[in-house]
Amino acid sequence: DLFNTLEASYCIEAAYHNFPKATIHIIGVDSERVGDTQHIAMQWDDHYFICADNGILNTLIQKKIPQKIVAITIHDRLNTDVCDMDVFVAVACHIARGGLLNVIGKEIPSLKPVSVLTSSITDDLSEIKGQIVYIDSFGNCVTNISQKQFNDTIRGRKFEIVIKNKKFSRLHKSYSDFPVSDVKQLKDLEGDFLALFNENGYLEIAIYKSNPKTVGSAATLLGLHFRDTVSIK
């Protein structure tokens, strides 16, 4: 989705650490500079991120304080017909040459406050509520409920994950984490639903060996969509 900043935010958080320090990440999702939405460059966790200040990076700064954020100010130095990505590329080239952020922008104290979907925990720690923030090409549905939230709230007690009319009372360690025997082999479990915390530490609802175009997926078979609610009780 070219304008889904929440989905992009999850993908960035999940992917950036697979790149070496000092990598420059150009983010072209909903990148137009309009109104109070500035173009920004941010140094965070020794990586550089260039994008519009539209909420995409707000999840990152909740986890760690940025090293520096600047509002990009080089637009009047470029040709009048340049697009947003041309600006981002010019900034990236400057950084790649060892240039300082203050040369291409004015330092700002923080990102623009933007309302984003966040998971929540009830005061009595009886329930976690979250939403689907990403659906991958296999139709697996990733939520914004983290494993840390789960561990801190559930604390080893019995639980029930509820999403639409489907309930889970067990977490799988991997996609193939099913009990097998001489009677029931792993191949016989293809199409079974499962819930697990993915490699990025977020709760995911999936189907073993799903295929949205043939046998179906968690998204298609359960009718799940972006922003749908999931709860753990």
Model feature map: region roles:
Residues 224-233:
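Surface-exposed interaction regions enriched in Ser/Thr/Asp/Glu
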Residues 28-31, 45, 52-54, 72-75, ...:
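Fold-independent oxyanion-binding glycine-rich loops
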Residues 78-155:
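Anionic-ligand-binding alpha/beta catalytic cores of soluble enzymes and soluble regulatory domains
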Residues 23-26, 39-41, 47-50, 67-71, ...:
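Structural motif
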Residues 14-16, 38-40, 60, 79-80, ...:
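A generic local secondary-structure boundary/capping motif
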Residues 144-224:
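A conserved acidic, glycine/proline-rich C-terminal tail/linker
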Residues 1-7, 11, 19-22, 26-29, ...:
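Active-site histidine-anchored catalytic micro-motif
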